[in-house]
A protein has these predicted regions:
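Eukaryotic polytopic
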Residues: 1-144
């Protein structure tokens, strides 16, 4: 019925979508905090936009292998892959910086509850690991 690669693609796309829903909720919870210096600015706006876009891409990829199809078109495919990689790195960088800034004393009003996993995951990471995760997720996304 389905090949193993199709099942893996569907599972990966579901996980990809759920993770980006979680990212969006995390960013929204920071935005809703009163007296939080992090609740406004380019990180919140762009983070919500990028993670919402990735949610839509993940949902589409569950039902149609659109990413695999688009990446094979010569001119459009290379641009799509490059934009995907840049957007994914930007999102991981935004989440990384938000988590890093939440720990500062001046941002003590920005503590969010229910997001310990994301805070613990990104608190001990650095920029090179964001690049590493971007490469891994991009390869999985386009080759599954």
């Amino acid at each position: 019925m389905f090949s193993i690669w199709t099942i893996l693609r569907i599972i990966f796309s579901i996980i990809f979508t759920v993770v980006h829903i979680y990212f969006t909720q995390f960013i929204n919870s920071i935005e809703e905090k009163k007296n939080c210096p992090l609740s406004t600015g380019w990180r919140i706006t762009n983070g919500k936009l990028i993670s919402s876009l990735f949610m839509i891409i993940g949902l589409i990829n569950i039902f149609l292998p659109a990413s695999k199809f688009l990446s094979t078109i010569p001119l459009i495919g290379s641009s799509y892959v490059l934009l995907f990689v840049i957007a994914l790195f930007s999102e991981l960088f935004i989440i990384y910086r938000l988590v890093d800034n939440i720990g500062d004393d001046e941002n003590s009003n920005c503590k969010v509850k229910g997001y310990n996993f994301i805070i613990n995951f990104f608190s001990d990471k650095d920029l090179s690991q964001c690049v590493f995760y971007t490469i891994i997720v991009s390869v999985l996304f386009f080759y599954l």
